[in-house]
Amino acid sequence: MNDFDPTTLSSPAAIGHNLRRRPLVRKKLSEMVEEELEQMIRRREFGEGEQLPSERELMAFFNVGRPSVREALAALKRKGLVQINNGERARISRPSADTIIGELSGMAKDFLSHPGGIAHFEQLRLFFESSLVRYAAEHATDAQIALLEQTLALNSQSLDDNALFIRSDVDFHRVLAGIPGNPIFMAIHVALLDWLLAARPAVADADLYEHNNTSYQQHIEIFNAIRRHDPDQADRALQTHLNSVFASWHTLSAQSSSDE
């Protein structure tokens, strides 16, 4: 057996043998400007709050036209790396959790429209909120429990007003998401509910009170378990609630489809 010769792996003949024909991806000038500016920002050549050079200076520096500079700055803004106000030079900013989630929003909404998309997001919400209620039952302060109780009061006062009830319903779950004090949790939760609510079917007026009251009673069960600092019961109550909500949504969606 011949000895291993590593030089043969990098020889032109070996490389040519392993190559497969594929087109080179040509980058737009704006993408090249964007990448270079992003690297400069991440290397902290510009500090947070500092202004970038003017568009004209960037055009001269990169030897590109104004459209390329503006497209690059717009892309950096979407990433949360710069803020752009009319009449001012772009200013360096720090990406927030909201910015990161916002970048995913379009893809998430597109995914929801595909078969099985809603079910996958429902499972994500169930796993996520299950951890939240367990944490809340173990760690919620008296002030946080009082805030959760306030959202229940709004729940009870809006059973006949669907728009108001949805708002108080979201507030209840949002307070839960805020208990750990992690801004990423909050951003994920806000986005997740926004995506799911956008796909939520309408409830008939005749069924509105019963539908909302069911959710309200289930919220009470979750709250009572958290107040007793019982994570297992809080988790069971949350699972019952969300599974009930999901089943209701699927029933309403099926009815809506059959009516079309």
Swiss-Prot record:
Claim: DNA-binding is one of the keywords in the record? yes
According to the entry, every stretch annotated as the HTH gntR-type domain falls at 27-95
Note whether Transcription occurs among the keywords: yes
| GO terms of molecular function | DNA binding; DNA-binding transcription factor activity
Any S-S bridges, and between which cysteines?
none
Q: Organism's domain of life? A: Bacteria
Stored SUPFAM superfamilies: GntR ligand-binding domain-like, Winged helix' DNA-binding domain
* DNA-binding region positions on the chain: 55-74
InterPro entries from the xrefs? GntR_C, TF_FadR/GntR_C, Tscrpt_reg_HTH_GntR, Tscrpt_reg_NanR, WH-like_DNA-bd_sf, WH_DNA-bd_sf
- Keywords, comma-separated and alphabetical: DNA-binding, Repressor, Transcription, Transcription regulation
> Record's family?
Belongs to the NanR family.
Q: What does this protein do?
A: Transcriptional repressor that controls expression of the genes required for the catabolism of sialic acids.
- Protein name as catalogued: HTH-type transcriptional repressor NanR
Organism, by scientific name, is Edwardsiella tarda (strain FL6-60)
Q: Which gene encodes it?
A: nanR
